[in-house]
Amino acid sequence: MIPLLLSLLAALVLTQAPAALADDLKEDSSEDRAFRVRIGAAQLRGVLGGALAIPCHVHHLRPPPSRRAAPGFPRVKWTFLSGDREVEVLVARGLRVKVNEAYRFRVALPAYPASLTDVSLVLSELRPNDSGVYRCEVQHGIDDSSDAVEVKVKGVVFLYREGSARYAFSFAGAQEACARIGARIATPEQLYAAYLGGYEQCDAGWLSDQTVRYPIQNPREACYGDMDGYPGVRNYGVVGPDDLYDVYCYAEDLNGELFLGAPPGKLTWEEARDYCLERGAQIASTGQLYAAWNGGLDRCSPGWLADGSVRYPIITPSQRCGGGLPGVKTLFLFPNQTGFPSKQNRFNVYCFRDSAHPSAFSEASSPASDGLEAIVTVTEKLEELQLPQEAVESESRGAIYSIPITEDGGGGSSTPEDPAEAPRTPLESETQSVAPPTGSSEEEGEALEEEERFKDTETPKEEKEQENLWVWPTELSSPLPTGLETEHSLSQVSPPAQAVLQVGASPSPRPPRVHGPTVETLQPPGEGSLTSTPDGAREVGGETGSPELSGVPREREEAGSSSLEDGPSLLPETWAPVGTREVETPSEEKSGRTVLTGTSVQAQPVLPTDSASRGGVAVAPSSGDCIPSPCHNGGTCLEEKEGFRCLCVPGYGGDLCDVGLHFCSPGWEPFQGACYKHFSTRRSWEEAESQCRALGAHLTSICTPEEQDFVNDRYREYQWIGLNDRTIEGDFLWSDGPPLLYENWNPGQPDSYFLSGENCVVMVWHDQGQWSDVPCNYHLSYTCKMGLVSCGPPPQLPLAQIFGRPRLRYAVDTVLRYRCRDGLAQRNLPLIRCQENGLWEAPQISCVPRRPARALRSMTAPEGPRGQLPRQRKALLTPPSSL
């Protein structure tokens, strides 16, 4: 028994010896150490864009050595550790300091070397990527010591817009929107700090100082940075408080608990609201979700939020969740980042419960990827270029299209679109069929080029890949801004055909576009317009009115002839005969050339034709009755002996031109004999002009100061006008043909800056609408203009055809030329003119068979007796009846 006890005692002594020996060695080491570095905190929190002091003090364990024993200053080194990276921030010895270039002007040792025991670091302009571990090391002689602390930078900047439209907030509305989602409007310093941390967003948004900016990491043709070709925060400067933009919001603290609710079958928006209320919570706001993501929340499950959006936070992205970048992902209906899912679709929900412990979120929720097969992001770049420095640039753009794919088909989907703002990246080769869930409609769409990039807090990363996409149920509609009545709804998609039926709805500042070769769109209750267009994506008009069916392709004008022999006319083949009108035939004919004679000139006194509205004669009480002009609607006042007379522009009549004889089409606005329609969709000058021509119009021409004020005040955007010098440098012409009778150039314009191809003209609305010449490939909004009176397609003749491609409408005084078919000879005048009453002149051309060469030689025979012509020649010169 005793030997057993002795052996156990010996074993116990042996096991305790190493620990005791280690403690003795540690105690001896501490006694030998001259000093110890202490930070005194396990974690520090800083605010985005602010400054943070990281304390670090040197505690001497024995009296410090004399200067003779340890000459010089201690060496101080601060190091940043994040993952596997270790970066020197600062190294200092006395007055000699070496700072890493990435931290230049941002770090300092405020007390050192005046105090050798205080080596605290101050880090300013905090960025999101400043979060990590900071290590403080001090070395003096042969002694050294170090300590570390974790730093967390809280606060996140994100772009916010409501689902109805882009650029919908005034400055006051932007502040209210951020407050409504549990955030506040960001400051310029916060946005700049987010940019320095890698944030990029190609959308112009309000900031707290009433400026409009957006951050760009990779300048490109779609989005420029601080300067031409350089990254930075693009700054529009201080703009008017009533201008409309998106807003950059800032969220910081989450004063409560945010958790994911994922019941079986998922929830509609109203069911999601009730789900949170039953658990003593409420639907989380967008700002709260961003704050939770900034605090570490990672959920690969789209869920409802209070504003009707569907989002999910990703910290660790993967191919099936988030693409390749972290951030809060948002599901949109349309490529221009608008349209939230229908509230009848089913998703999970993010709930928020107030708590006494801030910055807490539930980790005990259901699995992160419950029921989620994949999250696919489909993106197409929307091109937008900046304006030169003199004319503040146009709004920037982005394009993000996120579609969840679920097993039960209830996760929602979307209608693919082809953004007209990016015509330079055709992707017709990347097409595939879309597989719909059970019970939903079928659609054959076009898969856009994919980028693994979402709406928020990440840098774009392109990756071409095709995926199968679900289609949104037919109940979905495109949300419209407040005050707009009707909605667009999609129905069944037909098999491949050659037309796209499109429906116009109530006027929208940015009308949606439906893409696909065969999309059938149902018209909502009320009036609308229905147009048949060729295969391809076309813009849905926003006008309302009685239905109008047209079969003429809306294509660009092309040189060449188009036969009018076959096919019925779109208008009745009747016209009012008005007799022969002599028109000078151009010496050099050009196929498809339209000759305009200035119908858009309102103030120019032009003698009316027989069919024009002359107006009456009013008795003048005294001279000078034309100042101010009593004539309405752009009429010209002429003083006469017995009074004055008003010459009315086409479409108006009456003594004072106050009687409307013609009216603009639905969706077009009248002014002084012309109709105008504004498009907020950004296009290059050539694309905008082509779109206007497809509508039977042109980019607006400005012929009077009154017209300048109308266009600039009515449509308060940077916009193209029809003026250009694309043909001859310095020779500016209007695209619709009238002479240049009025100018409103900015000082120093046009300048064709360094011959950089500034051949098109933009109206800068905030500078009283003054004009500047800019490159034609900028993407701006535009206004189309057509005459109040116009003619339809020209009369069809069986043996003749019109030069050029027929159009839907022709302006008054447009002159067209017929030519006879091959083998026929032309007789009589081949020209017709569009009259002021909207009818074409009666064609006078006659086409007869050509005579053989022998018959032509006989025509040159000498005259017969008494000066008479040969009978055969006389018969040939007898004009035939009109064909």
Swiss-Prot record:
Domain Ig-like V-type: residue ranges: 35-154
Q: In which tissues is it expressed?
A: Brain.
All residue ranges annotated as the Link domain in the record: 156-251, 256-353
Q: Where does this polypeptide localize?
A: Secreted
Outline the extent of the Sushi domain. Answer: 789-849
Composition-biased stretches (Polar residues): 428-440
Gene Ontology biological process terms, A to Z: cell-matrix adhesion; central nervous system development; gliogenesis; hippocampus development; neuron projection extension; regulation of neuronal synaptic plasticity; skeletal system development; synapse maturation
Name the segments for region: Disordered: 389-574, 859-883
GO cellular component labels: axon; axon initial segment; cell surface; dendrite; extracellular matrix; extracellular space; GABA-ergic synapse; glutamatergic synapse
Biased segments, Acidic residues type: 441-451
Extract the SMART domains matched here: CCP, CLECT, EGF, IG, IGv, LINK
Chief location? secreted
Query: Boundaries of each C-type lectin domain copy?
Result: 658-786
Signal sequence extent: 1-22
- What keywords are assigned to this protein? Disulfide bond, EGF-like domain, Extracellular matrix, Glycoprotein, GPI-anchor, Hyaluronic acid, Immunoglobulin domain, Lectin, Lipoprotein, Membrane, Phosphoprotein, Proteoglycan, Repeat, Secreted, Signal, Sushi
Which Cys residues form disulphide pairs? C56-C136, C178-C249, C202-C223, C276-C351, C300-C321, C626-C637, C631-C646, C648-C657, C692-C784, C760-C776, C791-C834, C820-C847
Under the heading SUPFAM superfamilies, the entry gives: C-type lectin-like (SSF56436), Complement control module/SCR domain (SSF57535), Immunoglobulin (SSF48726)
Single Gene Ontology MF annotation: hyaluronic acid binding
Q: What does this protein do?
A: May play a role in the terminally differentiating and the adult nervous system during postnatal development. Could stabilize interactions between hyaluronan (HA) and brain proteoglycans. Isoform 2 may function as a chondroitin sulfate-bearing cell surface receptor.
Q: State the oligomer form and interacting partners.
A: Interacts with TNR.
| Family membership | Belongs to the aggrecan/versican proteoglycan family.
Q: What protein name applies here?
A: Brevican core protein
Cite the source lineage. Answer: Eukaryota, Metazoa, Chordata, Craniata, Vertebrata
User: What gene makes this protein?
Assistant: Bcan
